[in-house]
Every structure is written in structure tokens, then in C-alpha cells.
Amino acid sequence: MSYDQLPERLRKTCLALLLAMISPLHADLAANPSFLDERFVTLDDWQPMTFPNIKRHSTYSIHPCGDKTCLLMESDNSASGLLWEKTFNVYEYSFLKWRWKVSNVYRQGDSATKEGDDYPARLYVLFNYDPEKASAPKRIKYELAKLLHGQFPPDSSISYIWDNRETTKPFIVNAYASEARMIPVSSGSAQVDTWQEYSVNMLQDYKMAFGQDPPPLASLAIMCDSDNTQESAKAMVDYIRIGSVP
């Protein structure tokens, strides 16, 4: 028997039960449109993110910004980042907004090469790996990575970057990893040392860069690096927000 063939009273009862099941989710999202509102008063919720064989690390500190504080990121022939370890559902909280500025871009920076893969500022969205949904070759690859590093690497990532060179490309495949796609939100030196604000839809950007839907769970990381170019830069981050509305 189809839904349309049910008695009217029973159809109304089914509809009421369905609405009762989904309304708490909608009410929760409406009451909590913002999952993260990071104003960088402290770095208590952020953990260092370092890389094997890179001994010189970038530095991250809370810095005065007028009547408030910001995150100061400094890199001098170095690389490391900050990881926000909490996870969120990107289908429930699809919108990412932030404000930053950089002191300069890198003369030797080139997103097409490993030697030029440095950026004065980048904001990562790291999507969790799910072994139950992975192909057999991918499971083997990720199990080996877990043996080496103690945990699974991200399934994939998108990173919003300040590209060193002027570009109109909607996204760039990272020179080190095809699972990492970079989206230039600013490029070149025309706007250095000025605050730039961005608002993006992570779901749409992932689909644009990968041609498919993303895994549901993700976390954030932020970085200023210069180990490949051996140059230096500073960047400041005013805030980062994740929410269910733009």
C-alpha cells in the first residue's frame, strides 16, 4: 500500500510523527547557527601541527589588535601549523568566514611545484577518513599510514590560501598530495598588509574541487609556512567562524 492509499487520519499521524522527528534538528540549528566563533583570546583550543623531518617550526601567538586580540603567525624558513581538533558536520555547518592579512608573499612561491609550495596564510578544512566507505586499495594505503604515524591521515582537504602569484584558477591540486585541493581566495601582492574578509561555502567548494560530495566530518587547521622557499612572512588572523548560515 502506498502513502496515498492510507486513510487520511493515518496520513496525518505519519506526517506529524515525521515533523516531530526532524523539528528538533532544525530547532537546534536555528538556535545555534554558529558552531565556532574563534576570536583568538587564547590558543587553548588549538594544538601544534608539525611535520616529519621539518625541524624549524613557525610560531603562533596572541597579539594585540587595537582594542582586541588576534592570532599572529610568523614563519622564517619554517613550517608548522595549528590544529583545531574538534570535529563538525560540514552538512550541518557549511559556511566558513574569516578575516586575515599578510605582510608579504614569497618571491619563489609557486603553487605548481613542491619547491614553491609555501603560503603566508592558509586555512585548512580537513575531512575525516572513514575506512568503512573506502575502497580496498585506499584502506591498505591508510592502514600503512596509521602504522607509520599512529593515526589515520585526513581523507582529503581543501585549503583556502593567499597565493603568491596572481591567479584566476578556481582551485589548484597540491604539488605534494592529490587529495589536497587549494582554493586561492587572494593572490599576488596588491592587497598585502590590508585586512581581507572572506565567506565561503565549504560544501560547494569541495564539490567544485573534487567533483563529488565530501565526507561529513571535518576539522580545521591554519598555517603560515616558508620551508620550501626559505623566505619569511607574517600573517594576522582576526577571527574564524563556522556556521549554518552565511
Regions found by a protein language model. Name each.
Residues Y3-C14:
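Bacterial N-terminal signal peptides that target proteins for export
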Residues D28-N53, A136-P137, K141-Y142:
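Extracellular carbohydrate-recognition regions
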Residues D44-K68:
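Extracellular glycan-recognition surfaces and repeat-rich motifs
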Residues S61-G81:
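Short carbohydrate-recognition loop motifs
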Residues E85-L96, S189-V192:
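Extracellular/lumenal carbohydrate-interaction signature centered on repeated Trp-anchored short motifs
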Residues D118, N128-Y176:
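Extracellular/luminal beta-rich ligand-recognition
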Residues A121-L123, S178-G188, V192-Q230:
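Extracellular beta-strand ligand-recognition surfaces/modules
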Residues L220, I240-I242:
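Extracellular beta-strand elements of beta-rich domains used
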